[in-house]
């Protein structure tokens, strides 16, 4: 009798396990998106467009005429979708942020560059357009509120004195899938800042998290530097 009852239990367990497997097999496979870039940004093949020339980006319009060439530098990169995946992307949103190297480095508020739904995409800026809308995040050491400074000079003809050699413009990406869901590989922290030094922190801005990957394929960097001779 005990043997028969034990056999019955084993049969019941086996049947339950089989039924469970069958039910699980009917569930849709999860989308493993948490750390999977869907595009790979690529720098321009033109080496002059692979960085931002410091002197030409910083110069006033008058000083620019004394430089050679007397034009603002251009930064350019492109990207295409990775069609090897089953994930269907409808739109790629591109953002830019200003990063000041230091200890610790700071990253300013991000600004939307554009939303793209036709691929491949080539994005090209002259330095004035690149600096437009960007802000430097300043964290005082005296404990007062963090504040932001506009990078581009208020007078379009004036020098852009706030940029330095070694500064970076960081481009990051978000994907909107065909089902409407959003993929975010570069976490954002909403941060309260002041719009003036010493003022109250009453403005909230979206800032890249400190742990954000800023290297390809997660992001693209435009380095402000001198030409390599």
Regions found by a protein language model. Name each.
Residues 189-192:
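Flexible, surface-exposed loop regions and adjacent strand-edge segments
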